[in-house]
Amino acid sequence: MSRSSSPSVSLPLPSSATLFLDREDKTEEALGTFIELEQCTYTHKRLGDSRSNEFMECDCFEDYKDEQNHACDENSDCINRLTLIECVNDLCTSCGDDCQNQRFQKKEYADIAVFQTEKKGYGVRAERDIEANEFIYEYIGEVISEADFRDRMVDYDMRGFKHFYFMMLQAGEFIDATERGCLARFCNHSCNPNAYVSKWDVAGKLKMGIFAHRKILKGEEITFDYNVDRYGATAQPCYCDEPNCIGFLGGKTQTDAASLLPQNYADALGVRPSVEKKWVKMRKALGEEIDKSGSSNINIEFVESLELEPCVQYSDVNKVMSVLLQIDDKFICSKLLERILLTSDETMRYQIIKLHGYKCFSKLLGLFETDENTQHRILQYLSDLPKTTKNGIVSSQIDKKVESLLQKEALKEDASALLERWNTYETYQRIAKKDFTKTSNGLNKVTDFRRVRLPLGWEIIHENGRPMYYNAQRQIKRVDPPSDTHLQRPARTTPPQRYNGGFYDRTTKRPLDPESFEKRKRQRLEWEQQELAKKKQEEVRHLKEKLEVEKQKKSELEQIIEDANKQQEQQRLERLQKEKETAERRERRRQTHSASRIEHKWNKFFAQIVPNLIKSYATSMDRARIKECARDIVKILSSKELKKDATKVPPAEVTKEKRKKVNEFCKSYMDKLLAKMHEKAVSK
């Protein structure tokens, strides 16, 4: 059950990567097998829309070097980049035009080529080294609804398509690159891929991109895990030859080895592939069927079984917030909200606020409009968040959302208290690009100023026409950039103390008389002796605990060995039983496939006769009804032949006797149908 999720740490390069530099470049040949699209097309204009109601601005600033804007690059900490949102010219007002977070819009694709593989048809290889997490290609095709997806899946299967190119974009929406798409459609599957799929919000539309999971060498095939969000009508053998190969790809739900929910949901929920694998194994052992919600590709039962944990790393917050900003699935949102509500670490809470946190909470208050209990928990969490400026609250309009809750008696008190708290926050003018370009050297100043990475809780504000650093939680303003030391320990650690009617500072040193000096010296020696005794006691305690743990481990190991010896014979018997069941299933599949193939041949046999025999009835009913009758007659005749002999195949040519019998059946069927139609018309 491999998962190609967006990694926080790139995978190491394998010791022996296979290169295909000697294979002929088949790109031009491959382009002739489909219609190339420059961007996705939509069968309905609302398909592919992001679930965010408004565009999310980042807080980066222009950073021009060599006439190129380097803002929002890989190392910038851009909040849009962290939450998988692309910046858009004229909408992101501070980072400037043509920043580095516009890879989909600029089509900054990696240099790739199509080549012929041994068993998998066409494949895609890298024409240069590709670094970890680098954007490779957008998966482009026709964005269709779920109803169209199901129709096309049947249609392509009937037309005998060997390869499928469906990808789930979001709940109820799919990208179909089968007949219209781009070169990314030729990226093959691997159970141990070097690339992963990630979904980004680009100018209000959800886009699907392929990114490097690790460094990919020039000539190496680019692969990702189809079992994440890709669909096909019929299960196909997998030829990736990886040690962890699952054997098949495609089919109704990507086989039982497919992931239990989309990769970005799993990442945000903190689900590891091993957890999914263990759950699937347990369900199979109980003989229970594993299924997903058809429209959302989520196994509800599995998600309900998860024990959610708080966000403990920046990457956890990034993944949770990116999904919350993209979706409006109430079930998944409730689970991700639970992770946020469990997060009490102040560092993580600052990160939540930073990544469009107030906009996200405003969205959740609306999504759970009828769930007062959830709204109450959100209000309590908002009250516990660290203090910031009021700018984010106003721009997200969450204050208006909270004001609307004053009408609910159960929430009135909490909403009122939260609004009162927010009213104490200060509002500052946002630093805009124009404020720094009034002088000839203004741009260089703002570039240096905005490159400063601020410690936790600090913001950049604009006061009296100049930039300042502000910590709302500690009510501190600074002209020079703050450091972590300033965040952790203010300059004055203790307040001034009253002395003889005035004040003195405890941090001011005063000379000691000899008696006081000796007294302090004795106190220090006593304290050091006490600390030494405590450390010795602690060492003895740790040693006893270590011995006890080792004793317990030895006992557990002996028990494990004993249990293993007892179960060895049982495992052998289970293995033999499993091999027997596998052989029986293989035989049943062979028989089922054979019967289906014979039925298809009989359908084709009768389909070349029946339409011509009933076309004379075209004067009595419309063409569509005639076609429907032809299909029904073909199915009936095929069924009759299979009942006689399920192994018999139709003859190569239609005999006169067979044609006569078919003609008699068609005439009888159509006459009865016309009689029923006439009787129905008379009764009206």
Curated annotation (Swiss-Prot):
Residue ranges, compositional bias (Basic and acidic residues): 506-521, 568-586
Primary site of residence: nucleus
Protein name, as recorded: Histone-lysine N-methyltransferase, H3 lysine-36 specific
Domain annotation WW: ranges: 452-484
Function: Histone methyltransferase that trimethylates histone H3 'Lys-36' forming H3K36me3. Involved in transcription elongation as well as in transcription repression.
Occurrences of domain AWS (ranges): 53-108
Residue ranges of coiled coil: 518-594
Family stated for the protein in its record: Belongs to the class V-like SAM-binding methyltransferase superfamily. Histone-lysine methyltransferase family. SET2 subfamily.
GO CC entries: chromatin; cytosol; nucleus
Subcellular location: Nucleus; Chromosome
The keyword Nucleus belongs to this UniProt entry's keyword annotation: yes
Positions of the Post-SET domain: 234-250
SUPFAM superfamilies: SET domain (SSF82199), WW domain (SSF51045)
Domain-level remarks: The AWS and SET domains are necessary for transcription repression.
Record-level Gene Ontology MF annotations: histone H3K36 methyltransferase activity; histone H3K36 trimethyltransferase activity; RNA binding
Residue ranges annotated for the SET domain, each copy included: 110-227
Keywords on record: Chromosome, Coiled coil, Methyltransferase, Nucleus, Repressor, S-adenosyl-L-methionine, Transcription, Transcription regulation, Transferase
Annotated source species: Eremothecium gossypii (strain ATCC 10895 / CBS 109.51 / FGSC 9923 / NRRL Y-1056) (Yeast)
GO biological process: ascospore formation; DNA-templated transcription elongation; DNA-templated transcription termination; methylation; negative regulation of antisense RNA transcription; negative regulation of reciprocal meiotic recombination; regulation of DNA-templated DNA replication initiation; regulation of DNA-templated transcription
Keyword Hydrolase applies: no
EC numbers: 2.1.1.359
Known catalytic reactions: L-lysyl(36)-[histone H3] + 3 S-adenosyl-L-methionine = N(6),N(6),N(6)-trimethyl-L-lysyl(36)-[histone H3] + 3 S-adenosyl-L-homocysteine + 3 H(+)
